[in-house]
Amino acid sequence: MAKPDNRNDNVEKLQEMVQDTIENLEEAHETLQNNSLSRDQRQAIMEKNKRREESIRSFRNEIKDEYQDLH
């Protein structure tokens, strides 16, 4: 049997996901300072960072939606 949907902790989980993604983004920015990276490696990191930024925006929008649903 499937577990019931407990939405009470969704905001907290989403906030943790935002924080983790921000930390990954910051680490990637530090990695970009490495002069031994190839152009392809640098490009891959920058593309991944764009996706991370999009994820952060999406997570924050979900947080707003979840918060409004709870109140």
Swiss-Prot record:
<dbReference type="Pfam" id="PF19824">
    <property type="entry name" value="Tlp"/>
</dbReference>
<dbReference type="InterPro" id="IPR017524">
    <property type="entry name" value="SASP_thioredoxin-like"/>
</dbReference>
<feature type="compositionally biased region" description="Basic and acidic residues">
    <location>
        <begin position="39"/>
        <end position="56"/>
    </location>
</feature>
<feature type="region of interest" description="Disordered">
    <location>
        <begin position="30"/>
        <end position="56"/>
    </location>
</feature>
<protein>
    <recommendedName>
        <fullName>Protein Tlp homolog</fullName>
    </recommendedName>
</protein>
<comment type="similarity">
    <text>Belongs to the Tlp family.</text>
</comment>
